[in-house]
């Protein structure tokens, strides 16, 4: 069983009180020193000034030091030291989530940003045992890339699943791409069906809901871009290959390896997987991704995924 870390933070009420009172206290002390100078002479006043400096230094250092931070903040910092002290490949599921949370909070200043970036660049993978007995591997493809669905900021890390075998699923049942990703069969599987249910409960709880954009139809002049809140999602053509960012910008990992519409993902992988992008100016086609040929390939939306095909989906922590 993995160790559950609890994180929190914030400036302690005690420190806030000291800061709030400090201006008034400074004024009163300065007034006292002024009176002492008049009635007792500069020698005594100098001694008082020294004591005053010590007090102000103590008050001013409260937020940056450890004297006035909360127990929760201390625990958070210690926990992040542990995560930062490990190689990213050795991060537990809890530590992956902790790293993502800290990166979302602190950006490039996060103590784990460099290690997460190095792991993304190197293609480092993690794995999780699914409820169906199979193992799923995944890797980082984006850092502070996706917008949280609640509007509170960015998801720290975006991951992409290497493959998830799921035969017998169609993008859409009817012979049209109308409705696009939002109404697709695959999205329902990712929301609450076979795919979602295969993930362990503690894994599900760590996944963040993000906003994804997609066109609702391939029909010329009749399509519009819609936003959907998604925990598991297929990558769009632009997130994979770059270019027009209507459905999102290219993930950093794919840009790093030079993936474009005219490149190959990898000849060793012959599987086919859907993207969430419908093909423009068509009535019934969607873009799919192939490893053994140019990704510029489309399929009829009602085509069924066969046993040699898979779903490659993404998620965020």
Regions found by a protein language model. Name each.
Residues 1, 24, 46, 173-177, ...:
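Short intrinsically disordered, low-complexity coil segments enriched in acidic
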Residues 1-19:
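N-terminal leader/signal peptides at the extreme start of proteins
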Residues 5-7, 24, 54:
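Intrinsic structural disorder/low-complexity segments
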Residues 20-41:
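N-terminal single-pass transmembrane signal-anchor helix
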Residues 41-69:
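Aliphatic-rich helix starts adjacent to a transmembrane/signal segment
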Residues 72-317:
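Collagenous Gly-X-Y triple-helix signature in extracellular proteins
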